Amino acid sequence: GVVTLDTKLSEILPSYKNSNKKNVTLKSMLSHYARLRPWEPFYAHTLDSITKLPSEKYYRTIRSEKFDIEVTNNLFLRSDYQDTIQKIIKDSELLPSLKYRYSDFPYYILKKFIEKHYDNTLDNLVQDHFYQSLGANNTLYNPYHKISNKKIIPTEIDDYYRHQEVHGFVHDMGAAMQNGVGGHAGVFSNANDVAKIMQMFLQKGFYGGKRYFKPETLDKFNTCYFCDKGNRRGIGFDKPQLGEEGPTCGCISLNSFGHSGFTGTYAWADPEEEIVYVFLANRTYPNAGENLLLKENIRTEIQRLIYEAIID
């Protein structure tokens, strides 16, 4: 059948038919307005209760058929743990009240649906349908095995889960537990490639002589459906703030869209001024605790200076 933004979870994933999320629509879920919990530390369930190190019940240091998910260098998770992650999400409690709360869950759920629907993995799908023909040749999941680590910025010195320098593997623990391929995390890139992808969005699905999707698709995703409820989000995309605080300098068109990332990334496209702004940092290195990048508004201050320079 046809999937629209009003399609409910139970209509695309039969396992959700008896879930408290059965009536959640794609629109509300991707606008982060569906009472879904922000995240779940799945990795914590796999640590030894005494040593707090990865438990032998779940991990091995050598790959085998049963332990096939590489979460970092020489550490392999049980292959069947993917099902456990999906079950934890499906059975999770809803938040007590309906309000805007960013959640990673929609991207776990929809990754499962997309891979099932296309009978292919997400990393293959985006490579074949987008990155390759966009000429985004440095954009990929799991670069560790594909390009030299000298070209990859290290992510974090992890002292709570993987207990090593995470380098060439995704920072997000939940994505690492999905073999590095998350719907919400895991893509490595450089500023030039991200700019190509954002330019394709800016041109409503058209880039380099090729149409990737219809202009009206971008328009539907770049719409704030719950602005009247105080939720600024588009579908997947973040949008400029409605009040004081938010993801942009506050000096930018409401038609603009983009996203920021936990590890220090930021990409924003403004159709009015035809500007794409990309900022990439590894702010989680050496550790993720101190978020000076956010506290000092560095990404949005640079954005403000760009706009001041144009307007002047």
Language-model segments: which ranges?
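Short, glycine/proline-biased beta-turn/loop segments that scaffold the active-site neighborhood
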Residues: 4-19, 132-133
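Short, surface-exposed loop or secondary-structure junction motifs
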Residues: 21-254
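Structured C-terminal helix/loop/strand segments within mature extracytoplasmic catalytic/sensor domains
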Residues: 259-312
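A short, well-structured edge-of-sheet supersecondary motif
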Residues: 5, 72-78, 139, 267-270, ...
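Short, conserved catalytic-motif segment at the N-terminal edge
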Residues: 18, 165, 172, 288-289, ...
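Glycine-centered, phosphate/nucleic-acid-interacting loop/turn motifs that mediate DNA/RNA or nucleotide
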Residues: 1
